[in-house]
């Protein structure tokens, strides 16, 4: 252990030029390169991005069209969002409009089915 401490002390006292020279000498002696394998890291990044897109967890429920049963759609929007009558009517009148954002897939599917049962057309984004 004392030898390692001596080596560490000697390496710490090297100047930047001396350290660079030491690296070159060791590369030549051992036949290695001190360069980082950058291409490998760059190649794996797109695969990670594809996985993130495939595993979408938060959805936005968008009311695209009201259909013929506007009153029923307003009732369902009030139930889902907790909005008052005037706010829910305004949301329905402004379709296409997001009814709910950042919801899990199961909840988004449930909201979509309720709105479609009331006669609305809905998209999940």
Swiss-Prot record:
Pfam families: Ribosomal_L12 (PF00542), Ribosomal_L12_N (PF16320)
Transmembrane annotation, as ranges: none
A GO MF label: mRNA binding
This protein's GO CC annotations: cytoplasm; ribonucleoprotein complex; ribosome
Function comment: Forms part of the ribosomal stalk which helps the ribosome interact with GTP-bound translation factors. Is thus essential for accurate translation.
Family label: Belongs to the bacterial ribosomal protein bL12 family.
Subunit structure: Homodimer. Part of the ribosomal stalk of the 50S ribosomal subunit. Forms a multimeric L10(L12)X complex, where L10 forms an elongated spine to which 2 to 4 L12 dimers bind in a sequential fashion. Binds GTP-bound translation factors.
Protein name: Large ribosomal subunit protein bL12
Lineage: Bacteria, Pseudomonadati, Pseudomonadota, Alphaproteobacteria, Rickettsiales
């Amino acid at each position: 252990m004392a030898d390692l401490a001596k080596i560490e002390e000697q390496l710490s006292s090297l100047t930047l030029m001396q350290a660079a020279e030491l690296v070159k000498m060791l590369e030549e002696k051992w036949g290695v390169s001190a360069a980082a394998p950058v291409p490998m890291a760059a190649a794996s990044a797109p695969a990670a991005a594809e996985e993130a897109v495939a595993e979408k967890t938060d959805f936005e429920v968008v009311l695209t069209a009201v259909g013929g049963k506007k009153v029923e759609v307003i009732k369902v929007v009030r139930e889902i969002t907790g909005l008052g009558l005037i706010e829910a009517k305004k949301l329905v009148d402004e379709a296409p409009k997001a009814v709910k954002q950042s919801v899990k897939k199961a909840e988004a599917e449930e909201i979509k089915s309720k709105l479609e049962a009331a006669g609305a057309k809905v998209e999940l984004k």
